[in-house]
Amino acid sequence: MDKLGCKKKIIILARRIKWRINQCRYHLRFVNKKCMVAPGSSISRDLVAGAYSWIGPGSIIYPRVQIGKLALLANNVTIVGGDHNYRHAGVPMVFSGRDELKPTIIGDDVWIGAQSIIMTGVSIGNGAIVAAGSVVTKDVKPYSIVGGVPARFIKMRFNEYEIEQHEQMLKQPDSYFKQFEYLLLSGKDRS
């Protein structure tokens, strides 16, 4: 076996060991074994996440969140909600309870920049990019780039032809992406 082949095998083994540690740490039953969760995150046990997704250190993820495959959540991304019920006159908010959490859907191949806040109940379409430090309060269309407080449309990531090509790639089975797996940890480890 050549040096590169050996290095790839070591990298893949390191990923598997990290996954087992994360699985024990966060009790993640619905997260694909090829999804990586960095240490220092607060993750709801009902998180659903696809293969090759990355959740950066210091992230906070409330219940009822679904993350697609190949998604990147940078450091300190927060997905929050559960607003206090403030509509009961004569009752302090601390005793008024909370509204029911709405599901939050993050599509495939989405990149959410560092320090961004995503409010629960939002849907972020496939291939979208959320700029660092943004606050997302409304749905984000597929392949759009948004940023700001609150997040607003900046531009499209791809043209129509490129979107069609990219969608075809995203339809590939997880086994297709195995050829790129060693790139996830090669060079500098992200955690």
Describe the predicted segments one by one:
Residues 1-27, 33, 84-86, 102, ...:
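Terminal amphipathic alpha-helical/low-complexity segments used for targeting or macromolecular assembly
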Residues 21, 41-49, 54-122, 149, ...:
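Flexible, glycine/small-residue-enriched loop-and-beta-strand segment within the central core
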Residues 34-37, 55:
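Extracellular beta-strand-rich, repetitive "passenger/adhesive" scaffolds
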Residues 75, 132, 142:
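Residues that flank catalytic or metal-binding motifs in active/ligand-binding sites
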Residues 78-79, 135, 145:
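Conserved sequence/active-site signature of Rossmann-fold short-chain dehydrogenase/reductase
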Residues 114-129, 134-138:
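Beta-rich strand-turn-strand
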Residues 139-143, 173:
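Short arginine-rich
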Residues 142, 147-150:
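Acidic, glycine-centered active-site loop in nucleotide-sugar glycosyltransferases
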